[in-house]
């Protein structure tokens, strides 16, 4: 993987039709708790403003991919590429844990360790690794997927689009320095807005709705 600068930041927002929506931010930060509280307050304020602007104007996953290809030169990652293999492996594990945990037997629930106890943490990590290996060995037919990984490049940095047509999953993640992040943030907002929401999403505040609001509130 390419080495990022010390000021590199990354953001991932992932959501599915029924699954959880997650936001991951990573970067070097020495902010104090007060600054974090202020930042969170600003985010909540922005979120309320964004919610008032959301209207139903949905597009399908296929339409969104074509839109990104036409406007941002989106390219697809080959299934043989390491990144694709890692992503689909993670998706398979996530889907089995969420929808078919019974296949894992006693490994479906791994107790959280005592983080002050090194032996407890090592045992926990060992079980997580064993479970991941168990899932990886399961046939793909157990949890059918139609996964595709795409990229939009800006110089040496890129935005990734993760899509699964079977599970209706749409996710974006990107990284880079502040200048690149600003561009990717704008692209991300445009793509989430184009994917949009249905009237039912707005009415029921679905995961798809939450995903859009979250992205536009960042």
Describe the residue ranges of each PLM region.
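Mature, Sec-exported extracytoplasmic domains of Gram-positive
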Residues: 1-17, 21-218
């Amino acid at each position: 993987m390419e080495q990022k600068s010390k000021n590199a930041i990354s953001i991932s927002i992932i959501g599915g039709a029924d699954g959880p929506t997650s936001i991951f931010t990573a970067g070097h930060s020495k902010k104090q708790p007060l600054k974090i509280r202020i930042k969170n307050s600003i985010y909540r304020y922005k979120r309320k403003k964004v919610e008032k602007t959301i209207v139903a104007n949905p597009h399908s996953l296929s339409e969104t991919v074509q839109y990104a290809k036409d406007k941002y030169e989106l390219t697809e990652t080959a299934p043989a590429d390491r990144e694709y293999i890692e992503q689909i492996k993670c998706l398979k594990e996530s889907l089995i844990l969420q929808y078919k945990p019974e296949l894992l037997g006693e490994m479906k629930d791994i107790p959280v360790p005592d983080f002050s106890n090194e032996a407890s943490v090592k045992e926990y990590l060992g079980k997580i690794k064993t479970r991941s290996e168990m899932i990886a060995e399961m046939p793909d037919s157990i949890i059918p997927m139609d996964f595709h990984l795409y990229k939009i490049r800006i110089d040496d940095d890129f935005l990734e689009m993760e899509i699964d047509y079977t599970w209706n999953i749409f996710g974006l993640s990107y990284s880079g320095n502040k200048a690149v992040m600003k561009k990717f943030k704008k692209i991300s907002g445009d793509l989430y807005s184009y994917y949009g929401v249905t009237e039912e999403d707005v009415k029921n505040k679905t995961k798809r709705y939450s995903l859009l609001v979250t992205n536009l509130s960042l």
